[in-house]
Amino acid sequence: MKRIVRTAGLSIAAVSLMAGATACGSGGSGGSGGSDDSGTGGGAGFDPIAALRTAEKSTDGADSAKVESTTTMGSVMSMTADGVLAWGDGLTGNLIITYTGGTMADTMRQMGSTSMEARYLPDAYYAKMGDTFAEQSGGKHWIKYAYDDLETLGGGSGAYLKDQMQNTTPNQSVKLLLASGDVRKVGEETVRGQETTHYSGRVDVADLAEKNSSLSRSQLDDLKKTLDQAGVTTETVDIWVDDQDLLVKKVEKGETTAGAYSQTAYYSDYGTDVSVEEPPAADTADFTELVKQ
């Protein structure tokens, strides 16, 4: 039972690690994007590439924002994330992650709670687990994932996750569309009371990993193998940009071997203050030590 609880906690914490990367940047699979807002097509002569370049620079320069996201992946999980993230000097921030469905939520209930706190620092990620986990892990409530360890233990996929965690920003979604060469203006739409412009495009995940990361050839080959095994090929990214050229909504949809993947994220209060503290060392267990037990 002790080992089961530790293993479950590590798995859930790892999924939550990716929640930060995807909420702030991009990471999914293939399919078709969409929106619950209505819109009209772009006018003749409009250059979506130029508009997106402006949005990419404006969003990158804003440095921080409040983030709300919902993510689903087949029958494995559905979850929400709510908090603040900053990206001026690596990804930092706090998110409250709640598992609302799927096998992950069932596992969390067995551990006493369906919610957890996630803290992101430039060199590591921390997940606060429940008391049940602490009882089986020497009384420690937090799990630490150092990004350098992810690269060492996770091969190409770990190296890519490390790269994304240290370099990701909300404007990564805009960069994806720019790099894909397949982007169109869908129309003008209202999102949460704001007038926005909606853009959509299809991206090749493995190809963009090569264009937008610092991975070596062997790491890229390893990542591509992992993506292929997961059924990840292409995905559709939809973004909504306001009149300040800031990203206010992102939708990614696709398919994996685990089922349909979808994430919707909303961004607001750009420039908000973000303060993150490293959890107490005495209450923190390193995941590299936990996996050995």
Give names to the regions the model predicted.
Residues 3-6, 25-293:
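Subset-of-secretome marker
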Residues 1-13:
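Bacterial N-terminal signal peptides that target proteins for export
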Residues 15-17:
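Extended, amphipathic alpha-helical scaffolds
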Residues 19-23:
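C-terminal motif of bacterial Sec signal peptides marking the signal peptidase cleavage site
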